[in-house]
């Protein structure tokens, strides 16, 4: 069957690369894709924006697309799944109503409260003075979140009162995140270790993916501003078997059943961003309605199952008939970013030293890249590449990933040097 992957990031390169390994796949299109997907012999880019729903739908109908997999959040939140389903096309992702779990942080916090799903204490605000009064009452550290989509950057962890007040003013009065910040969530600062817990949902059944841990801050040792993610590894040792069971029982199942009970039946990837306390209690920091980026890259490197088969089962309500199979070895991905990211950065720099052939137990996934007129790969985003590797331990996977990354150069390239440090400190 022909398959369409929507999106242009590292996540979509990884999903397309994995989908192409399926015996069910004939032709795989990526809309709009990037230089990495353009250079994959098994993938073909289509010049349609991820948010051009009419264009995507017309393409799917004219190219006999049997399955569409949605990568990013933006098309989900504007209803790509609703449009494809209305046309009778199989698409794996949540409806516009169900995608509110990511599209509105206030909706999510209220939903969690209604269903007694563990999360941080919070309040929603549209009024600056009321928000400032709450911040002064609670004190720092405290977390300020823009309500809407802000490309993973709309969260300020304020360690001082002054930072908190600045964040409130920037969002509510200063328009720092446009419409996304016209309502904010102010919530308690949670201590613990973060994990990304991603599952597939078909409306009723749940199939967990491998666990992972992202590294949100731009600098080594988790310093500097938040980003879309500077690297990830899988599995996350903080998610022990006991914690895994708690997450399923206290977070995932109540969410899937709660959404169904409220008339928003959830299908697609569901990503719970969790904080896990020292005693193993998970609390929800956020939900995403899609696979994480960069978590997808190390997770796909470990996946042995047929991704297409699983996504099809997800569209047919048959995930209860499926299991997922994983390489026992851990994997780790390091993001190579453009100088200046997550603030202003240059684009259009030629990337040198990319591997010319497939490497054993490793893969360079492209994110913010494109081909220029000379067919050279150039930078086209803040997060440019995710260099991913398998190893017998997280430490070995880390060593191999950095070794692969070493030869790749462009003007201003940088990366964190400590991806995976928490797992390595645990002796994994």
Swiss-Prot record:
It is an enzyme of class 6 (ligase). SUPFAM superfamilies: Glutathione synthetase ATP-binding domain-like (SSF56059), PreATP-grasp domain (SSF52440), Rudiment single hybrid motif (SSF51246). It holds the Pfam family GARS_N. The keyword NAD does not apply. The keyword Secreted does not apply. ATP binds at residues 135-196. Binds 1 Mg(2+) or Mn(2+) ion per subunit. Its EC number is 6.3.4.13. Its cofactor is Mg(2+); Mn(2+). NCBIfam families: purD. This is Phosphoribosylamine--glycine ligase. Belongs to the GARS family. Gene3D superfamilies: 3.40.50.20, ATP-grasp fold, A domain, ATP-grasp fold, B domain, Phosphoribosylglycinamide synthetase, C-terminal domain. Keywords: ATP-binding, Ligase, Magnesium, Manganese, Metal-binding, Nucleotide-binding, Purine biosynthesis. Residues 109-316 form the ATP-grasp domain. The lineage of its organism: Bacteria, Pseudomonadati, Pseudomonadota, Gammaproteobacteria, Enterobacterales. GO terms for biological process: 'de novo' IMP biosynthetic process; purine nucleobase biosynthetic process. The gene is purD. It comes from the Bacteria. Pathway: Purine metabolism; IMP biosynthesis via de novo pathway; N(1)-(5-phospho-D-ribosyl)glycinamide from 5-phospho-alpha-D-ribose 1-diphosphate: step 2/2.
